[in-house]
Amino acid sequence: MEKVRRILVHLSKENAAPQCARFLQSITGHFVGSAEDQATVSCSLENNRFILGDRLCDGGVPLKRASFCPIKYLSDSEAVSLPSETLSRGVDVGVAVLLQSANQKLLLTRRASSLRSFPNVWVPPGGHVELDEKLLDAGLRELLEETGLNLSPDEICSRLLGLWESVYPPMLTIGLPKRHHIVTYILLKSSQTHLQIQASLRPDPAEVSACVWVDADLVKAVVSAVDGEKECVQIPADLPESIGVTKVSPDGEMSESSLPVSVLCNRAPDYGEDIERVSTGTKFALELWLKTLEHHADMG
């Protein structure tokens, strides 16, 4: 039997042996049914299998999907039209790192326009988990590969924030599913300020076209622009109209520029070409990050 070359999601309920999730299987729906979009699960990476279960220790971790998740609404006729190589993929595992500076700013990167999935969309640095890697090691490796930031586990504090069920394209109106992931969001707290970290930033232009540091006030505005809702997004009057960003040229040269805050508050379009925005999964992770700040303030 050919060795599996990717880490895949496996599911377990009620102490049953973990089974490899199917590409068309709703991971969130497996635990909460079709009506709900969020579950609380256990997760572990064992023998190159990412196992999600319903036996909770230490409260479990949140798992969420978009209200418009394509897997949730895929019809039987659409499902049978998918190519066999897509159907046989299983559900991949990704990791994304929310790097928090000592002055409580988060690093986001804009995906290069040449990337196959989610081009020009703002996300935390991240990528696939490789064989025999731990989640944190995978996150640190991806951070280094995409941004040039070389952090060792002993100089940061880390915690798992939550899990996001990601499907690309993100809506059926845009196209049938080609990729299905569970993204693990890990919070990394650095003892350096964002300016100190910025001095070491060397983004890979094949992956990243811009970087930005966001604070809690801006993040609150970003997450208020809930994807799938129709109401007009209200940007608080006390926020600046634009924010400073570091652009990355195709040859890797960095330059300072500005970006309208309204771009970061864009919603995912219902159809047609995607637009520059913060990804839906990232908004979920940013909401979880805000809760950690609130908890820290309460403890303080």
UniProtKB/Swiss-Prot annotation:
CDD domains: NUDIX_Nudt17. Transmembrane segments: none annotated. GO terms for biological process: NAD catabolic process; NADH metabolic process; NADP catabolic process. A motif (Nudix box) lies at residues 127-148. Keywords: Hydrolase, Magnesium, Manganese, Metal-binding. Mg(2+) binds at residues 142, 146. Residues 88-239 form the Nudix hydrolase domain. Its EC number is 3.6.1.62. Gene3D superfamilies: Nucleoside Triphosphate Pyrophosphohydrolase (3.90.79.10). One of its GO terms (molecular function) is metal ion binding. Its cofactor is Mg(2+); Mn(2+). It comes from the Eukaryota. GO terms for cellular component: peroxisome. It catalyses: a 5'-end (N(7)-methyl 5'-triphosphoguanosine)-ribonucleoside in mRNA + H2O = N(7)-methyl-GDP + a 5'-end phospho-ribonucleoside in mRNA + 2 H(+). It holds the Pfam family NUDIX. It is an enzyme of class 3 (hydrolase). Belongs to the Nudix hydrolase family. Acts as a decapping enzyme capable of hydrolyzing monomethylated capped RNAs (in vitro). Hydrolyzes monomethylated capped RNA after alpha and beta phosphates to form N(7)-methyl-GDP. Shows low activity towards unmethylated capped RNA. This is m7GpppN-mRNA hydrolase NUDT17. The lineage of its organism: Eukaryota, Metazoa, Chordata, Craniata, Vertebrata. The gene is nudt17.
